[in-house]
Amino acid sequence: MKALIILGFLFLSVAVQGKVFERCELARTLKKLGLDGYKGVSLANWLCLTKWESSYNTKATNYNPGSESTDYGIFQINSKWWCNDGKTPNAVDGCHVSCSELMENDIAKAVACAKQIVSEQGITAWVAWKSHCRDHDVSSYVEGCTL
């Protein structure tokens, strides 16, 4: 009986954690979904951004008390401007997507929204990119990956 309970908690923790991509796995996925070079942003920059935003975790969330909004998913897309979580006051929902969809293991919708954000605001829309990737050598993020 104890073994079943422990097994149940293990499955629950995996479901709550979501998918944590390996670096090269994410590089291949982002390339397949068309982010490599999209709007002039290299694949290495996208990997740097997602490393610092979410540690490559699809279920990452971060609440922002000042704006009463939450950042969701592997790109940490904000509910005030880009997705609908049903609880953020005066939300815009610029990507016309549910925030929960941005946390799916299949990151196609998250990538589509990231493309919209970078098209409208550039890569500088992400604070983590400005802090950790801009003006840095980001080539190590794709180093050793078979693309």
From Swiss-Prot:
<dbReference type="Pfam" id="PF00062">
    <property type="entry name" value="Lys"/>
</dbReference>
<dbReference type="GO" id="GO:0050830">
    <property type="term" value="P:defense response to Gram-positive bacterium"/>
</dbReference>
<feature type="disulfide bond">
    <location>
        <begin position="95"/>
        <end position="113"/>
    </location>
</feature>
<feature type="signal peptide">
    <location>
        <begin position="1"/>
        <end position="18"/>
    </location>
</feature>
<feature type="disulfide bond">
    <location>
        <begin position="24"/>
        <end position="145"/>
    </location>
</feature>
<comment type="subunit">
    <text>Monomer.</text>
</comment>
<comment type="similarity">
    <text>Belongs to the glycosyl hydrolase 22 family.</text>
</comment>
<dbReference type="InterPro" id="IPR023346">
    <property type="entry name" value="Lysozyme-like_dom_sf"/>
</dbReference>
<feature type="disulfide bond">
    <location>
        <begin position="48"/>
        <end position="133"/>
    </location>
</feature>
<keyword id="KW-0378">Hydrolase</keyword>
<keyword id="KW-0326">Glycosidase</keyword>
<feature type="active site">
    <location>
        <position position="53"/>
    </location>
</feature>
<dbReference type="GO" id="GO:0003796">
    <property type="term" value="F:lysozyme activity"/>
</dbReference>
<keyword id="KW-1015">Disulfide bond</keyword>
<dbReference type="GO" id="GO:0031640">
    <property type="term" value="P:killing of cells of another organism"/>
</dbReference>
<dbReference type="GO" id="GO:0050829">
    <property type="term" value="P:defense response to Gram-negative bacterium"/>
</dbReference>
<keyword id="KW-0081">Bacteriolytic enzyme</keyword>
<comment type="function">
    <text>Lysozymes have primarily a bacteriolytic function; those in tissues and body fluids are associated with the monocyte-macrophage system and enhance the activity of immunoagents.</text>
</comment>
<feature type="disulfide bond">
    <location>
        <begin position="83"/>
        <end position="99"/>
    </location>
</feature>
<dbReference type="GO" id="GO:0007586">
    <property type="term" value="P:digestion"/>
</dbReference>
<keyword id="KW-0732">Signal</keyword>
<keyword id="KW-0222">Digestion</keyword>
<feature type="active site">
    <location>
        <position position="71"/>
    </location>
</feature>
<dbReference type="InterPro" id="IPR000974">
    <property type="entry name" value="Glyco_hydro_22_lys"/>
</dbReference>
<dbReference type="InterPro" id="IPR019799">
    <property type="entry name" value="Glyco_hydro_22_CS"/>
</dbReference>
<keyword id="KW-0929">Antimicrobial</keyword>
<protein>
    <recommendedName>
        <fullName>Lysozyme C-1</fullName>
        <ecNumber>3.2.1.17</ecNumber>
    </recommendedName>
</protein>
<dbReference type="InterPro" id="IPR001916">
    <property type="entry name" value="Glyco_hydro_22"/>
</dbReference>
<feature type="domain" description="C-type lysozyme">
    <location>
        <begin position="19"/>
        <end position="147"/>
    </location>
</feature>
